[in-house]
Amino acid sequence: ALPICNNLLSAGYVGGNLPLGKLNVYAGVRFEYNRMELVSHTQKNEESPTSVFYTYDDFFPSVNAAYRLNDKHQFRLSYGRTVNRPEFREVSSSVYYDFDLASNVQGNYNLKPAYIDNLDFGYEFYPSSGELISVSLFYKRFKNPIEWTYTVSGGTDLIYSYVNAKGADNYGVEVDIRKNLDFIGMRNFSLSLNGALIKSKVKFEPGAKEKDRPMQGQSPYLINAGFFYQHADSGWNAALLYNRIGKRIIGVGRSLGTADNEVRVPDSYEMPRNAVDLSVSKKIGNLEIKVAVRDLLAEKVSFKQFEETRHGKVEQITRQYK
């Protein structure tokens, strides 16, 4: 059964803008008070007689500076702190079945919020109205990132759960391009391209058995593309979208058992796949009719494990589905 839960979030924000000629600086800070109450059920559907409370008091500063060379060129530098607080099911001991993973999932009472410090530096070029070329460098520092992992229930049954890593660092480069296609005679058509290269590394406690690896859920690259048609007079709009992500860890492996009888569950990876979506819409007065088709290629979703042996890595396909 699902847990009984209540959530209270109160927040306040103060900020100010400081224009200094070509340089504009905006800074602010947000305060949040969050109180979560959780009453879980056991696997036998028995309700706990007491509530568990999670209370957080957090400040989130942010600074955004933009230096405008002229109407078409500018540099940006920004910093901000954000948070990823556990969801109710992530801290509940109740077990639920995840159909995508084809496995049971159980929360972790001791899960902590993850705090992220974000730093970005970028250059932006606006060739004309609605067009953009930007290149940015980014760095993200994670404290207590929340990750999927495995645990044991009922003796030998493996189920998914959540844990906090000590920390993680992500950094990389991102390119964003938006271009109208009038210059090749394709009026009302536009193209967008977005790509990122990311290096990710998790930090571990001294003496931990884990090796260097990317953060769970983080891909080494991301590719997005879009082909758009917009005709304001007729009200017709269409979009063809493409997406691809690199191989990423979907479940963090761990060592189980004693030192004399230790079993290592390898990391589980979601393999790259291509996804294409199509949508067409028509405006009729104040109404809009829209038809959308997702995942036109219908490529299989594959999860694999790579186990290291004395002879090298052994690849094993653990699950595939469409």
Question: What kind of feature is each model-predicted range?
Answer:
Residues K143, A232, R244-A259, S281-K322:
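C-terminal beta-signal and adjacent terminal beta-strands/loops
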Residues F138-R141, I159-V252:
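Gram-negative outer-membrane beta-barrel transporters
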Residues N6-S10, T55-F59, Y115-L119, G167-V173, ...:
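Residues that define the transmembrane beta-barrel architecture of outer-membrane proteins
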Residues A1, E37-E46, F88-S94, L101-A102, ...:
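Outer-membrane beta-barrel translocator domains and adjoining extracellular loop/strand segments
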Residues C5-R141, F228, L241:
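Structural signature of Gram-negative outer-membrane beta-barrels, strongest in the C-terminal barrel
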Residues K22-V25, K72-F75, S129-I133, I184-F189, ...:
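Repeated loop/turn-to-beta-strand initiation elements of outer-membrane beta-barrel proteins
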Residues A1-P3, K44-V52, N104-Y109, L158-A165, ...:
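Extracellular loop and loop/strand-boundary signature of outer-membrane beta-barrel proteins
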